[in-house]
Amino acid sequence: MSYLIKNSKITHFLTYRFLFCLFLISLTSCKTDKKLLTAQQIIDNSIKVSGVDKVHNSTLSFNFRDKKYIAERNSGVFVLKRISAMKDLQIEDQLSNQGFQRLINSRASMVADSMAVKYIESINSVHYFSVLPYGLNDNAVQKKLLKSTIIKGKKYYKVQITFNEDGGGVDFDDVFIYWIGAEDFKIDYLAYTFHVNGGGMRFREVRKEHLIEGTRLLDYNNFKPKDTNTKLSDLDKAFENNKLIKASEINLENIKITFN
């Protein structure tokens, strides 16, 4: 009788050990899977979670500072507009697959090439940031996964974005870094270099999210480094250590979106 009881205890013990080992293997496997995500997979997940994949066929309008912006997208065909009013004049700048044009009171107006380049940069920049991470799967985009980091106690994937010269636009040599939540795949921070107006770096912190028709659009606090020698990849550390200066706020207002 005691022999049977002893064997029963051994059997239960071995069964427990076996199940516990299976649990550890499963847990380790899950953690390993997360570590093995590629930059492409992380961006894909972020686009899906943010709902901006639907922007591909939509009309989006919003106000930014003193201008109105409208983006019409239809399966790769796009028209990006910036509209401003001055007294009796309405100026509408358009950037599309066909190029750039300016309309003044609905009539085409000539623009010097040197000025057109500046207008294109400005229009493209506002529309680009307004729907992030949409656009991060464009053909010209190159993705690189950097070392994960923690900001304010939250773990982030760190993805660097660069662009091919062919298809990367006039600012193809800009570099971006996105901090994407390791659990929720939301962009909470981003940083970038720029070369216009003397160049520099900026670090953006999401200050508010707008959920419009299932699409996550963002407002930001915009920072610049106190030390101009700070590396772009170290701006997250500079942010945590209060070594950034708030330069501005990026707020989208009167947001409307309809899907085709």
Whereabouts are the PLM-identified features?
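Extended lipid/amphipathic-ligand handling interfaces
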Residues: S46, A71-R73, R207-E209
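Bacterial Sec-dependent N-terminal signal peptides
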Residues: M1-A39
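Short, hydrophobic/aromatic-rich segments at coil-to-beta transitions
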Residues: V55-S61, S75-K81, G153-Q160, I187-Y189, ...
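Gly/Pro-enriched, hydrophobic low-complexity segments
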Residues: Y157-I257
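N-terminal, post-signal-peptide region of Sec/Tat-exported proteins
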Residues: N63-D93
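Mid-chain, structured segments of secreted extracytoplasmic proteins
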Residues: K81-V117
